Amino acid sequence: MRLPVTLYPGEDGFIVAECPVIPGCISQGRTEEEALANIKEAIELCLEVRKEAGLPLTLPLHEIEVAI
């Protein structure tokens, strides 16, 4: 399964990793590699919990660009 992940700067120099198609699935790391490893683990746990709860594994992602 391939899922989108967003990386962005967090507090204290951490990199935040978030999977936008799984509500609340977020992690962080001191490096991009650590953040990606941590979000992979978080995704596995989130999918397991959603499956056990009978929830859809992922939600649709609708990306749009906004001009400002």
Features from the language model and the residues they span:
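A short, exposed loop/beta-hairpin motif centered on an aromatic-Gly-Thr core
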Residues: P23-E32
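Short aromatic-glycine-(Arg/Gly/Cys) micro-motifs in beta-strand/loop hairpins
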Residues: Y8-I22
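Short, charged, surface-exposed hinge/linker loops at domain edges
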Residues: M1-P4, A37-I68
